[in-house]
């Protein structure tokens, strides 16, 4: 037999066996079908979405506070089909609307720096309605606390940035809690200042000094426990762009000339402390939390310069700040009716840095004057912003008898 005929015979033999056993052919086909189903099932298991839920680990440090959590898988729960018809359409704010006013930087991209600052504005949230969460608290309690912190800052020659960091920590912490007792406010306030001083000051006051200024109301152990509670509640996010930082930046951008030196102050110290005094007074009012820090600083700058300067320094338009400018009118009238703020000389503080040291004046009395001016505005007796300037309210000795 030739080699070719033997190959043909071997090829025809399995074909004959297949035709002789149809049952075996059905078994092979069933196995192929089963294998295909197994592969499809495995693919579905791989692509199937997992369900998770959040479970608290520890009890909250404070009543109504937050606590650390873990995420656990819940495969037994079915994934429901989302009904998007009940949701409301929202328009998100575009961070690229306002172009960067920053000049070219030798140490980084000015556009990236600017966008990072704007992102912090949306990430570090504050809200004037936090008092709704605390039934025992009244708006003036916050004002009294912040005024006291201003005084502590001046006594220990702390920087303005330190105070505004403490103010931000306090306001954001209160948003995370519920039904805080009014007796806890001083502890929360001094602890916020304690945290801020460790972040900002080169030579921060010692822990015992912060306990000392409370006159025995808060011990060192109380401050340390509250420090941990605040840090956990804020999720260790401690780097906001404060109101005073925005003001510093705007004045610097406006003062820069052809050869900019961004890191060295180029603006007038006198102008800075005048506007800073206005912001100190404004921040005591809880309604200031209705505005972003950037808007507050730009509105204050507008009252002491012009809208053209604000556009150049901040990239904001009149529509962005008009509401805040109008809200700030009574504060401006009270500040301008008092003697202008003067640069103070502090021991061991250089002349170049003295404008950055926080000062204190009788802000609570000034805030009372603001509230009095607001009563006239509500009655239509005081116009908002006019081209000729801002009307000065009557002196306290000239108030009508029925308005006391």
Curated annotation (Swiss-Prot):
SUPFAM superfamilies named in the record: Cyclin-like
SMART domains cross-referenced by the UniProt entry: CYCLIN, Cyclin_C
Predominant place of localization: nucleus
Compositional bias per record (Polar residues), positions renumbered to this chain: 7-26
Ranges annotated as biased composition (Basic and acidic residues): 35-45
Keywords: Cell cycle, Cell division, Cyclin, Nucleus, Phosphoprotein
Localization terms from the record: Nucleus
GO cellular component: cyclin E1-CDK2 complex; cyclin E2-CDK2 complex; cytoplasm; microtubule organizing center; nucleus
Positions carrying Phosphothreonine: 392
Residue(s) carrying N6-lactoyllysine: 348
UniProt region (Disordered), positions on chain: 1-45
Top-level taxon: Eukaryota
GO-annotated molecular function: cyclin-dependent protein serine/threonine kinase regulator activity
Pfam families given in the database record: Cyclin_C, Cyclin_N
GO aspect biological process, one term: DNA replication initiation
Post-translational modification: Phosphorylation by CDK2 triggers its release from CDK2 and degradation via the ubiquitin proteasome pathway.
Residues that bear Phosphoserine: 21, 383
Record-stated family: Belongs to the cyclin family. Cyclin E subfamily.
Biological function: Essential for the control of the cell cycle at the late G1 and early S phase.
Subunit structure: Interacts with the CDK2 (in vivo) and CDK3 (in vitro) protein kinases to form a serine/threonine kinase holoenzyme complex. The cyclin subunit imparts substrate specificity to the complex.
Protein known as: G1/S-specific cyclin-E2
Source organism of the structure: Bos taurus (Bovine)
């Amino acid at each position: 037999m030739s080699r070719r005929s033997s190959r043909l015979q071997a090829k025809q033999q399995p074909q004959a066996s297949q035709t002789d056993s149809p049952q075996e052919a059905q078994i092979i086909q069933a196995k192929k079908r089963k294998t295909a189903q197994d592969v499809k099932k495995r693919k579905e298991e791989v692509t199937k979405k997992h369900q998770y839920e959040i479970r608290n680990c520890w009890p909250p440090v404070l009543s109504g506070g937050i606590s650390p959590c873990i995420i656990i898988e819940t495969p037994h729960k079915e994934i429901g089909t989302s009904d998007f018809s009940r949701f409301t359409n929202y328009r998100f704010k575009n961070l690229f609307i306002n172009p960067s006013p920053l000049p070219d930087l030798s140490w980084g991209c000015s556009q990236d720096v600017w966008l990072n600052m704007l992102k912090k504005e949306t990430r570090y949230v504050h809200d004037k309605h936090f008092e709704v969460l605390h039934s025992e608290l009244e708006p003036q309690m916050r004002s009294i606390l912040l005024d006291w912190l201003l005084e502590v800052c001046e006594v220990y020659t702390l920087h303005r940035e330190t105070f505004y960091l403490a103010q931000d920590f306090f306001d954001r912490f209160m948003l995370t809690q519920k039904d805080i007792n009014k007796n806890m406010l001083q502890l929360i306030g001094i602890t916020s200042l304690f945290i801020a001083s460790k972040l900002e000051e080169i030579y921060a006051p010692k822990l015992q000094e912060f306990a000392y200024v409370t006159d025995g109301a808060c011990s060192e152990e109380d401050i340390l426990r509250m420090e941990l509670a605040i840090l956990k509640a804020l999720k260790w996010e401690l780097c906001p762009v404060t109101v005073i930082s925005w003001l510093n930046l705007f004045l610097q951008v406006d003062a820069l000339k052809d050869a900019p030196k961004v890191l060295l102050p180029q603006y007038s110290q006198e102008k800075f402390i005048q506007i800073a005094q206005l912001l100190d007074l404004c921040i005591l009012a809880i309604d200031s939390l209705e505005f972003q820090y950037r808007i507050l600083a730009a509105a204050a700058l507008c009252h002491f310069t012009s809208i053209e300067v604000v556009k150049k320094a901040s990239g904001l338009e009149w529509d962005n700040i008009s509401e805040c400018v109008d809200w700030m009118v009574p504060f401006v009238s009270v500040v301008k009716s008092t003697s202008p703020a003067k640069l103070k000389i502090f021991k061991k503080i250089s002349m170049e840095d003295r404008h950055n040291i926080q000062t204190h004046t009788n802000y609570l009395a000034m805030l009372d004057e603001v509230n009095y001016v607001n009563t006239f505005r509500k009655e239509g007796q005081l116009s908002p912003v006019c081209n000729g300037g801002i009307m000065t309210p009557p002196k306290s000795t000239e108030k009508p008898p029925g308005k006391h």
